[in-house]
């Protein structure tokens, strides 16, 4: 199954810009990709089900709303059976379609990104390591999709259930390479603290988390194709250095913070949270990241709605220790606020559902 419309079908500007960047027709067509889905036929079905089309439509709406494109290696946490059942496949991984090659059209190039149903174990492996590596492991076993990565909604085993040695393989990959996940779209917000009263931000963050019913409870993660420098700010937008800031995340986004520190910052990389409502972006930056706006003397820099936060080597260990509760979040009442007065930083974790 595949959909059309994320790429430019007309070339006359009615849906997408008639040209895409300086390369014109040599650049991407529309958003530059289309979605595909391979589903194993259930013996009880006499015709193809409609739910894959609904999921693809929801993802397309997300792309049109945010302008964020999807690539092989990305993932989507969905939090319920993709077909509405009690299936363990409650999340999606994005891979290169093994059959549909990059196509050059009169209106630009088109990639084909395949949706693959995934268990929680597989989603977490992608977040902690990388999407292509996990997909290569899934291809080994017919039950997890085989070479064509066919989604079987009746699958009850993850790759780790099928082959426990995979856990060590993934752990070694994380140790050697860190995480390729460099950004997610989630519920987040930030505010400059002027009078040391952060209640305003707390209310704003809760408001943001209830705005979008279509994609209210999903998180979309991007691998290294996501460029933190491409956040939606004007080239001439003024940079403002801030003294104190307050960050807020929903629980699912917050659960990734230990990964951000261990798998990204400790490896000298950056990580970006983009608000699903489109009005906030937060990038955590390691000291070795080049081209950032922040430095040791000015660790917080804002450019329009985009905030950069420098996590210095001296701050990293303290931050990891303070956020250790996220490893057992069920034991903590939410919202929970953590403060680092010596670094002028406050962070709040809000519940996923308000």
Predicted segments, located by residue:
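Generic alpha-helical propensity signal that fires on short helical segments
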Residues: 55, 77, 130-133, 291, ...
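Short, surface-exposed linear patches
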Residues: 58-59, 136-139, 331
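Aromatic/basic-lined ligand-recognition segments
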Residues: 1-39, 70-247
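Compact, glycine/acidic-enriched structural inserts
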Residues: 37-70
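Short, structured coil/loop segments at alpha-helix boundaries
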Residues: 45, 49, 130-131, 312
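Short acidic, glycine/tyrosine-flanked loop/strand segments centered on an H-E-D-like triad
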Residues: 18-45, 318-324, 340-342, 350-354
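Long C-terminal appendages of very large multidomain proteins
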Residues: 184-354
């Amino acid at each position: 199954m595949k959909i059309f419309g994320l790429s430019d079908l007309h070339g006359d500007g009615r849906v997408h810009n008639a040209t895409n960047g300086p390369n014109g027709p040599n650049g991407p067509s529309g958003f530059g990709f289309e979605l595909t889905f391979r589903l194993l036929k259930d013996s009880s079905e006499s015709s193809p089900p409609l739910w894959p089309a609904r999921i693809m439509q929801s993802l397309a709406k997300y792309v049109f709303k945010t302008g964020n494109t999807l690539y092989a290696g990305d993932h989507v946490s969905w939090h319920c059976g993709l077909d509405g059942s009690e299936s363990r496949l409650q999340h999606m991984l994005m891979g290169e379609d093994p059959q549909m090659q990059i196509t050059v059209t009169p209106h630009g190039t088109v990639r084909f990104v395949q949706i693959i149903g995934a268990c929680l174990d597989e989603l977490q492996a992608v977040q902690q390591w990388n999407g292509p590596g996990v997909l290569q492991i899934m291809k080994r076993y017919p039950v997890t999709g085989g070479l064509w990565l066919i989604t079987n909604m009746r699958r009850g085993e993850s790759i780790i259930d099928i082959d426990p040695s995979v856990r060590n393989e993934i752990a070694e990959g994380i140790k050697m390479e860190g995480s390729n996940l460099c950004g997610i779209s989630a519920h987040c917000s930030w505010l400059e603290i002027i009078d040391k009263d952060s209640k305003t931000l707390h209310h704003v963050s809760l408001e943001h988390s209830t705005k979008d019913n279509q994609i209210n409870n999903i998180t979309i993660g991007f691998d290294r194709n996501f460029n933190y420098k491409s956040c939606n700010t004007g080239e001439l937008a003024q940079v403002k250095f801030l003294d104190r800031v307050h960050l807020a995340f929903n629980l699912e986004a917050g659960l990734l913070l230990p990964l951000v520190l261990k798998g990204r910052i400790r490896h000298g990389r950056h990580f970006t949270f983009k608000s699903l409502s489109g009005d906030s972006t937060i990038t955590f930056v390691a000291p070795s990241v080049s081209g950032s706006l922040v430095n040791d003397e000015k660790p917080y820099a804002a450019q329009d709605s985009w905030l950069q936060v420098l996590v210095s080597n001296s701050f990293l260990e303290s931050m990891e220790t303070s956020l250790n509760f996220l490893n057992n979040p069920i034991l903590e009442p939410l919202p929970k606020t953590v403060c680092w007065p010596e670094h002028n930083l406050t962070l709040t974790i809000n519940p996923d559902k308000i």
